[in-house]
């Protein structure tokens, strides 16, 4: 009996991940305090163990200035002898735009397949990505079919956008150094330097994977999540795209 109860609590009130209140998906409310009360004691202990295990798996790499210069050069940078961000900074000599855009919107989508845009899937593609094909055909649009995914999950992709660095399993959203100052190559830092107000909209919940605190530490002025968006078909992971973009549109109309 004790073993069965232990298994039950291990998965957070169920015998499988899908129906459980797992520590990675228990953040359903906007209050950190209430989210902590939702999480049962065994799952809370399992969370500590999981995060500690991830941190232990990280490697400390010490490079000499010469080795650092060689590695920066190998990925297109010019080592300036001072810092990483400066080694990848480029200053333009000719302005490309006569007028700076009033707003710039970047959509980071998970599991958005390219196949509906391909000619061999023209019939379903014409319906599924009708608007997307119109944008792609615009003379002002650009696209590529040669790209690598930032990572294998949601947080690695978000980390890549926020830090400007490739995913190497370092978990920057949990690293204390990440909260001391923003990464210079992250999208928030770049847009702030260009004079923009930075607003991050997340279709999930803010306390998942520490995403809100991490985002605000990386040069974003505001963070909005699923708890602020009316939705009738939301789930443990957040709201649907329709409700997300509806909330964003209403905000931009203000």
What is the predicted function of each stretch?
Residues 13-254:
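Soluble catalytic regions of membrane-associated enzymes that act on cell-envelope
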């Amino acid at each position: 009996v004790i073993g069965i109860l232990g298994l039950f609590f291990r998965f957070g009130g169920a015998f499988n991940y899908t129906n459980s209140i797992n520590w990675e998906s228990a953040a359903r409310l906007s209050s950190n305090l209430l989210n902590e009360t939702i999480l049962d004691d065994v799952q809370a202990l399992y969370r500590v163990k999981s995060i500690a295990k991830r941190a232990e798996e990280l490697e400390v790499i010490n490079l000499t200035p010469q080795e650092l210069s060689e590695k920066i050069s190998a990925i297109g940078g010019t080592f300036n002898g001072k810092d990483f961000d400066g080694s990848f900074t480029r200053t333009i000599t000719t302005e490309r735009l006569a007028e700076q855009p009033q707003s710039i919107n970047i959509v980071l989508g998970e599991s958005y397949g390219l196949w509906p845009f391909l000619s061999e899937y023209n019939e379903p593609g014409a319906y599924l990505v009708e608007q997307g094909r119109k944008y792609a055909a615009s003379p002002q649009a650009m696209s590529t079919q040669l790209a690598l995914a930032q990572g294998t999950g949601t947080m690695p992709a978000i980390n890549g956008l926020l830090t400007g660095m490739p995913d190497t399993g370092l978990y920057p959203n949990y690293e204390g150094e990440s909260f001391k100052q923003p990464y210079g190559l992250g999208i928030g830092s770049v847009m702030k330097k260009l004079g923009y107000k930075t607003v991050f909209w997340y279709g999930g919940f803010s306390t998942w994977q520490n995403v809100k605190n991490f985002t605000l530490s990386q040069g974003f002025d505001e963070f909005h999540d699923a708890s602020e968006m009316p939705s009738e078909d939301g789930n443990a992971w957040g709201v649907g795209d329709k409700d997300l973009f509806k909330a964003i549109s209403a905000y931009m109309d203000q």
